[in-house]
Curated annotation (Swiss-Prot):
Family indicated by similarity: Belongs to the cytidine and deoxycytidylate deaminase family.
Domain CMP/dCMP-type deaminase: 49-183
Protein name per the record: Probable deoxycytidylate deaminase
UniProt keyword list: Hydrolase, Metal-binding, Nucleotide biosynthesis, Zinc
Cofactor or coenzyme needed: Zn(2+)
Described purpose of this protein according to its UniProt entry: Supplies the nucleotide substrate for thymidylate synthetase.
A GO molecular-function descriptor: dCMP deaminase activity
Organism expressing this protein natively: Caenorhabditis elegans
Domain of life: Eukaryota
Catalytic activity: dCMP + H2O + H(+) = dUMP + NH4(+)
Active site residues per record: 119 (proton donor)
Amino acid sequence: MVPPITSDEFCETSGCFGDSANLHTTLERLKININSDAKKLVDTNGDLKKHQRFLRIAKVTSLRSKDPNTQVGCVIVDKDNCIVSVGYNGFPIGVDDDVFRWDKEDPEDNKHLYVVHAEMNAIINKRCTTLHDCTVYVTLFPCNKCAQMLIQSRVKKVYFLENRDELAFRASKKMLDHARLPYEQIVMPQEAYVIEL
């Protein structure tokens, strides 16, 4: 059984992102609390436990999104298994949720025109100079635009939870395959999403 996320991990991940200073402070705390025991994450299941742990953090991060339909979280980890960035889908800084709605019906107010995706936010808010050789953990397989950014950032691999059979995701797979950027879906048991408060 995968151990539940502790209240400390939840608070560290869910209460941040008010501004970039808050993000950097929280990432520093995450690095200490989450990554100090990174070596313990590898067990008889190989790296599976480590991947599940970072995907759980991505899942908790997704709870920060105000999107009523699709909450996505992303965690980027360096070669030492230290978190260098997190992101979730939402409107750009300074864009009011009350003015810009999460609508998909009206073409001019369609949320897809305005929302910054979790992967994009994580890339923009990184705490390092480069993402070269970093690993990405995301709750939803990256769309074609996010795949472009991940390829350009030269990340090493993408792990994801959920996949969709839609044009943007098929195009993404085609690009990732051609760029030889590996991706892998991790199936997690339901109890892996339990959060202890």
